[in-house]
Swiss-Prot record:
This is HTH-type transcriptional repressor CutR. Residues 3-58 form the HTH deoR-type domain. Gene3D superfamilies: 3.30.70.2050, Winged helix-like DNA-binding domain superfamily/Winged helix DNA-binding domain. It comes from the Bacteria. It comes from Bacillus subtilis (strain 168).
Amino acid sequence: MLPINRQQHILKWLKEEGSLRISDISARFGVSEMTVYRDVNQLVQSNQVIKTAGGITLPVRTPQTDHMCSYCLKPVNQAHSVQLITVNQDIEQLCCAHCAFLRYADKTEEVSHLICRDFLLQTTVSAGSAYFVVNAELNLHCCQPQAIPFATLDHAERFQKGFGGAVCTFDQALEDMLQDRKKRCTCTKK
């Protein structure tokens, strides 16, 4: 079984049981505890689980965390925020499209919708149908490299003429963010 499949099973079990011991996970999968620790560490790094003494649990959501990015833990600025809606109808707030792309990549199978705001008009738009200007010279003072969403290709191209960058579809921007994740990502994600 691949690590991503084990991680999905771990998250499913956590939702059903609340907490799990590393030794129990190891026994269920028939793998070493070291293998489980590697899987769990990836979930901890993406803020999907919290380590406890000898085990793991799901993070507790508080009203304060609703105003913090679920990826990098920065405060969410409503003008640039993105909402990730899961198939279970859970809503995660993200500070910008950059973090939304990275969070989406971490949990693609669980995502139902990504909702963002058009940069110029501040209207709500599905990220899947939006156009993004990636690496524009205008600094939004959020995570880098930045991806700025637009509802129309025309607006994205006009913005690009003034501020540079590359106009991308959702899939192209996602690929760019994932390639730059290790090189230029400025997220303070722990």
